[in-house]
């Protein structure tokens, strides 16, 4: 059994999703939640809260591997920079605990789950719910975090079949 933590980084709210993968490659939902960062003081205090919150989550759920969404450049450079800082804090929380980090672009996650890189959030939420047999509507941040974890599980399985690392497996999937 392998436990994967998926992270959808954000400067106001970071999505967390945890799944277990059995020996046959089946995914099972373990936990999902947003890590709320607003109201934590200035931006540096939010980053501190993110670092501490992820550390506590890692200690509680003990993931084996971590998958995180890459930053994409939107309309606002300032927002992208803040998102990059949040992503950096998240990665620090992970590597400080000697866990491997695997990175995926949002388009790669959408392609892996929905079959097209331009899928919208509703389609991703729907597929995550189906794949993990979840009832009810998922929050976008949690759905994205679970989607990143599922994507990594698929890439990981492909890598094992091919006898290559996950980066090489993803390159072959495209």
From Swiss-Prot:
UniProtKB keywords: Cytoplasm, DNA damage, DNA recombination, DNA repair, DNA-binding, Endonuclease, Hydrolase, Magnesium, Metal-binding, Nuclease
Compartments where found: Cytoplasm
Broad class of enzyme this protein falls into: hydrolase
GO MF, one annotated term: magnesium ion binding
Active site feature: 8, 69, 141
Domain of life: Bacteria
Note on cofactor: Binds 2 Mg(2+) ion per subunit.
Record keyword Cell inner membrane present: no
Entry binding sites for Mg(2+) 2: 69
Names of the cofactor(s): Mg(2+)
Keyword Chaperone tagged: no
Predominant subcellular localization, coarse grouping: cytoplasm
Biological process annotations from GO: DNA recombination; DNA repair
Binding site for Mg(2+) 1: 8, 141
E.C. code: 3.1.21.10
One Gene Ontology cellular component annotation held by this UniProt entry: Holliday junction resolvase complex
Entry-linked InterPro entries: RNaseH-like_sf, RNaseH_sf, X-over_junc_endoDNase_Mg_BS, X-over_junc_endoDNase_RuvC
Catalytic activity: Endonucleolytic cleavage at a junction such as a reciprocal single-stranded crossover between two homologous DNA duplexes (Holliday junction)
Family according to the record: Belongs to the RuvC family.
Role of this protein: The RuvA-RuvB-RuvC complex processes Holliday junction (HJ) DNA during genetic recombination and DNA repair. Endonuclease that resolves HJ intermediates. Cleaves cruciform DNA by making single-stranded nicks across the HJ at symmetrical positions within the homologous arms, yielding a 5'-phosphate and a 3'-hydroxyl group; requires a central core of homology in the junction. The consensus cleavage sequence is 5'-(A/T)TT(C/G)-3'. Cleavage occurs on the 3'-side of the TT dinucleotide at the point of strand exchange.
Oligomer status and interactors: Homodimer which binds Holliday junction (HJ) DNA. The HJ becomes 2-fold symmetrical on binding to RuvC with unstacked arms; it has a different conformation from HJ DNA in complex with RuvA. In the full resolvosome a probable DNA-RuvA(4)-RuvB(12)-RuvC(2) complex forms which resolves the HJ.
NCBIfam families named among the record's database cross-references: ruvC
UniProt name for this protein: Crossover junction endodeoxyribonuclease RuvC
Organism (species): Xanthomonas euvesicatoria pv. vesicatoria (strain 85-10) (Xanthomonas campestris pv. vesicatoria)
Organism placement in taxonomy: Bacteria, Pseudomonadati, Pseudomonadota, Gammaproteobacteria, Lysobacterales
């Amino acid at each position: 059994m392998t436990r994967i933590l998926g992270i959808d980084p954000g400067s106001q709210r970071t999505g967390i999703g945890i799944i277990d993968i059995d020996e046959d490659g089946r995914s099972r939902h373990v936990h999902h939640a947003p890590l709320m960062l607003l109201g934590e003081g200035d931006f540096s205090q939010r980053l501190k809260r993110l670092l501490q919150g992820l550390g506590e989550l890692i200690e509680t759920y003990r993931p084996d591997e971590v998958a995180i969404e890459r930053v994409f450049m939107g309309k606002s450079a300032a927002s992208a920079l803040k998102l990059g800082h949040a992503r950096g804090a998240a990665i620090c929380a992970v590597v400080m605990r000697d866990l491997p980090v695997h990175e995926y672009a949002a388009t790669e996650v959408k392609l892996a789950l929905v079959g097209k890189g331009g899928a919208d959030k509703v389609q991703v939420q729907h597929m995550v719910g189906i794949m993990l047999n979840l009832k009810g509507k998922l929050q976008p941040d949690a759905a994205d975090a679970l989607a990143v974890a599922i994507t990594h599980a698929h890439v990981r399985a492909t890598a094992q079949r091919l006898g290559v690392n996950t980066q090489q497996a993803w390159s072959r999937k495209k």
